[in-house]
Amino acid sequence: MKKVIALDIGGTNTRVALINENYEVEKVLINPTVVGNLDLFLQNVSKTVREAIDDFSGVVAIAAGVPGRVRHDGYIYALPNVHVTSIPLSEYLEKEFHLPCFVRNDAEIAALAEANVGPYKTYKSLYFVTISTGVGGALCIDGKLVNSSYEVGHTMTSYHNEIHEFEHMASGTGLRRLADMNGLNIANAKEFFDLVQNKHPLALRVYKDWIKMLSDWIEMNQENFSPDVFALTGGVMKSKDIFFEDLKRACPSANIVECACGQQAGLIGAAVFGFQNAK
């Protein structure tokens, strides 16, 4: 059976898994990510792969998801949370292991997982959205990524007669900015949603604005791309019991669901990408 070595590289940990064609995880290893030094970062990724995989028979590719902008040849411009730039990850791993290596942004990788494995794989088109410290997203059609330079979080939006980047207002951290603009001081998104749940008058007003901003953005993308489903994930979904039904009611033309792959999305999506691109 063919297999892919899947990597999920984050600012804290690097996860490596051996995944077969049925998207079953056969082996997995987690090591701390080395930050601040490019050479040591690359060496640590290679070391983690070697520690995790002792038998390369059947392996057709290495594939990785990373939290940064990636050129289509696997060159990473920067990993802000890892504090390294100009990273030739694909080239480095191909030389190390003599296997083709494919690298994409972690949001795109997670989108592939949702579009190919689990309950939403029956949809022809899926728009993946993650709302945490920022806003990320990707569109899949027939289980494959639609390549685009469109960065969803950098969509411009108007608020109080000023123009802002969408993620600067609607993300988890953006909620603090949105609240501050209305005279509400909060430490984080959790505190904000607690206030909403307790019907704090000012928090409810900000909440109404946030729901409208997010729903307008989803409706705009529904009109532009007509996906069969929007799959949402990210830190704000920890408060889904408070806002999710309100958001769905505010988006009558969109089919909005919660992502299903959870913590495995990065590894499963990387495996999908590897199998799709391996010759």
Task: Kindly give the residue locations of the regions a language model identified.
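Short beta-strand scaffold segments in enzyme catalytic cores
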Residues: 14-18, 135-140
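ATP-binding/phosphotransfer module of carbohydrate and carboxylate kinases, centering on a glycine-rich
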Residues: 1-61, 70-73, 91-99, 113-127, ...
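Beta-strand initiation motifs
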Residues: 23-27, 144-150
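Active-site glycine-centered loops adjacent to acidic/histidine catalytic or metal-binding residues
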Residues: 106, 132
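Adenylate-forming
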Residues: 110-116, 136-139
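A charged helix-plus-loop insertion that forms the helical arch/lid used to bind
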Residues: 76-85
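General beta-strand structural signal in soluble alpha/beta enzymes
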Residues: 101-105
